[in-house]
């Protein structure tokens, strides 16, 4: 992904997250950083999101194992509930979609194996509300 396209996608996603009530920041680092830093991290309630962000005109994106590992390693540094996310802006359908990786491995993200970001927000909001209402 072209650096400017990547930066713009990351900024757009941070704006979307903030619009949904998350505290979100872009971490401008290179993939070569030895630190386990995601492209974006966001918090809401006791939930921490660690996000690898991509943008494409294609119908799929390959995310490398080391990119997934940095999401998981970043979350392991915190005690709050963490959710690793791969967020893809599929430009041909004008839609942000997300996938929650289960382990560090190469992953092909497609429109079919991911969910709309709005669905993720509904799931997370329900989880946050349940934690607030449950003593």
Curated annotation (Swiss-Prot):
It catalyses: Endonucleolytic cleavage at a junction such as a reciprocal single-stranded crossover between two homologous DNA duplexes (Holliday junction). InterPro entries: Hjc, Hjc_arc, Restrct_endonuc-II-like, tRNA_endonuc-like_dom_sf. One of its GO terms (biological process) is DNA repair. Binds 1 Mg(2+) ion per subunit. Changing residue 30 to A/C/T: 100- to 1000-fold reduction in kcat. The keyword Hydrolase applies. Keywords: DNA damage, DNA recombination, DNA repair, DNA-binding, Endonuclease, Hydrolase, Magnesium, Metal-binding, Nuclease. A structure-specific endonuclease that resolves Holliday junction (HJ) intermediates during genetic recombination. Acts only on 4-way DNA junctions in a sequence non-specific manner; introduces paired nicks in opposing strands 2 bases 3' of the point of strand exchange only on continuous strands of 4-way junction DNA. Cleaves both mobile and immobile junctions. This is Crossover junction endodeoxyribonuclease Hje. It comes from Saccharolobus solfataricus (strain ATCC 35092 / DSM 1617 / JCM 11322 / P2).
């Amino acid at each position: 992904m072209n650096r400017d396209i990547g930066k713009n996608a990351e900024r757009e996603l941070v704006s979307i997250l903030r619009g949904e009530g998350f505290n979100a920041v872009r971490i401008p680092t290179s993939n070569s950083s030895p630190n386990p830093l995601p492209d974006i991290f966001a918090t809401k309630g006791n939930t921490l999101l660690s996000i690898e962000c991509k943008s494409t005109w294609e119908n799929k994106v390959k995310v490398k194992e080391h990119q997934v590992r940095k999401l998981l390693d970043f979350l392991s540094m915190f005690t709050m509930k963490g959710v690793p996310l791969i967020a893809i802006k599929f430009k041909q359908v004008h839609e942000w979609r997300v996938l929650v990786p289960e382990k560090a491995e190469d992953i092909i993200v497609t429109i079919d194996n991911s969910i709309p970001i709005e669905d993720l927000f509904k799931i997370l909001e329900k989880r946050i509300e349940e934690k607030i209402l449950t003593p």
